Curated annotation (Swiss-Prot):
Family matches, as InterPro entries: Ribosomal_bL27 (IPR001684), Ribosomal_bL27_CS (IPR018261)
GO biological processes: translation
Protein name from the UniProt record: Large ribosomal subunit protein bL27
An annotated Gene Ontology molecular function: structural constituent of ribosome
Entry similarity comment: Belongs to the bacterial ribosomal protein bL27 family.
Species of the source: Corynebacterium aurimucosum (strain ATCC 700975 / DSM 44827 / CIP 107346 / CN-1) (Corynebacterium nigricans)
GO CC annotations on file: cytosolic large ribosomal subunit
Length: 92
């Protein structure tokens, strides 16, 4: 095996593809059922009302409505306020 590198070879130049993690829908935004709200590794955000959690810890909407972020018992939660409730609160 050669102990000197041949011309123009490099041991660099490899990296993994970015995973595009993060919050996809922010507080106050309207979502439809099934829309992804947060892509994450581990449970940085926990599912709250009307929010489901996928096998890769992705949070998604179970109902149409407005996204709401909050904290409960030191955990960051993501809730969906259903569209009917949001309309009722606005008129009240």
């Amino acid at each position: 095996m050669a102990h000197k590198k041949g011309a123009s070879s490099s041991s660099n130049g490899r990296d993994s593809e970015s995973k595009r993690l993060g919050v996809k829908r922010f507080g106050g935004q309207q979502v439809k059922a099934g829309e992804i709200i947060v892509r994450q590794r581990g449970t940085k955000f926990h599912p709250g009302e009307n929010v489901g959690r996928g096998g890769d810890d992705t949070l998604f909407a179970l109902a149409a409505g407005s996204v709401e972020f909050g904290v409960k018992r030191g955990r960051r939660l993501v809730n969906i306020v259903p569209a009917e409730e949001a309309a009722a609160e606005a008129t009240a």
